[in-house]
Amino acid sequence: MQRRTRGINTGLLLLLSQVFQIGINNIPPVTLATLAVNVWFFLNPWKPLYHSCISVEKCYQQKDWQRLLLSPLHHGDDWHLYFNMVSMLWKGVKLERRLGSRWFAYVIATFSLLTGVVYLLLQFTVAELLNQPDFKRNCAVGFSGVLFALKVLSNHYCPGGFVNILGFPVPNRFACWAELVAIHFCTPGTSFAGHLAGILVGLMYTQGPLKKIMDTCAGIFISHAGPSGQQNHFNNAGPSGYQNHYADGRPVTYDATYRNYDVYTAGLSEEEQLERALRASIWDRGNTRNGPMPYGFRLPPEEMRRQRLHRFDGQ
């Protein structure tokens, strides 16, 4: 692992151009905050890379557990940051809008911690099985493990279709495994164990007990925090039964939005909806004097339905 050099951060400039090309108001808040935190730690590292990376030797044997928190937020150089954050940008836009901002923030925090723990377990196991203590000294840093976990979630929610990896079409459900192997052979300096740890954490969420454990912990926290005006109920397909309340206490339930989803999406996939929304935002900027609505601005349901149907009828 090399220490980054000072100079023009071309990767950082490209990342900023990507963000402004999409539009800050089109990026959900937790995704945007995750990008901002990673960029801030890149420009103002909490500790040098050698003191923030994770390894069995440093974390387990020397009890330096704070590295589990620091390692996902530090990157080797501006290109390492760029590729990770561009990937985070597109995964975050899709997943945060599906899961909701609070749950997505919970997922990011949990995955950031667990990928480090699983990485240490993998390195320790390999070192013991092969009798190679050098594996205990391998030090990893970066957000890519979390991204592989999010990749598993994205493929779980959108299992159909193919992606092109090194010129070969690969089904979405196997894409993370193909990328794991491809990155390892094309870029030998990357952490194979770190990426594998991310995949395993993602599978623990989609196929294992992790999501139920997170649901239970969230329920305990909410019960201790007391009643609130909003309740979120989650299942394996994301949020359902989102409930809000009027000022007089009457509940407003949005289950019908999910049952009549095609009315709002015109039958488009998530990727097509995202592309159309970005194009519409760009068109609105060029043809109106008013700026785009901030993220999270909510129209009344009937007004939203009227505007969307009017837009689709005009195309």
From Swiss-Prot:
The chain crosses the membrane at residues 22-42, 104-124, 138-154, 181-201. It catalyses: Cleaves type-1 transmembrane domains using a catalytic dyad composed of serine and histidine that are contributed by different transmembrane domains. Changing L274A: Inhibits interaction with ubiquitin and ubiquitinated proteins. Reduces the cleavage of PTCRA. Its main location: endoplasmic reticulum. InterPro entries: Peptidase_S54_rhomboid_dom, Rhomboid-like_sf. One of its GO terms (biological process) is spermatid differentiation. The keyword Transmembrane applies. It is found in: Endoplasmic reticulum membrane; Mitochondrion membrane. Gene3D superfamilies: Rhomboid-like. Residues 269-284 are annotated as: Ubiquitin-binding domain (UBD). Residues 1-21, 125-137, 202-315 are cytoplasmic. Inhibited by aprotinin. GO terms for cellular component: endoplasmic reticulum membrane; endoplasmic reticulum quality control compartment; mitochondrial membrane. Keywords: Apoptosis, Differentiation, Endoplasmic reticulum, Hydrolase, Membrane, Mitochondrion, Protease, Serine protease, Spermatogenesis, Transmembrane, Transmembrane helix. It comes from the Eukaryota. Residues 43-103, 155-180 are lumenal. Expressed in testis (at protein level). Expressed in intestine, lung, brain, kidney, epididymis, stomach, muscle, spleen, liver, heart and testis. It is an enzyme of class 3 (hydrolase). Its EC number is 3.4.21.105. Belongs to the peptidase S54 family. Intramembrane-cleaving serine protease that cleaves single transmembrane or multi-pass membrane proteins in the hydrophobic plane of the membrane, luminal loops and juxtamembrane regions. Involved in regulated intramembrane proteolysis and the subsequent release of functional polypeptides from their membrane anchors. Functional component of endoplasmic reticulum-associated degradation (ERAD) for misfolded membrane proteins. Required for the degradation process of some specific misfolded endoplasmic reticulum (ER) luminal proteins. Interacts with BIK and STEAP3. Interacts (via C-terminal domain) with VCP/P97. Interacts with ubiquitin and ubiquitinated proteins. This is Rhomboid-related protein 4.
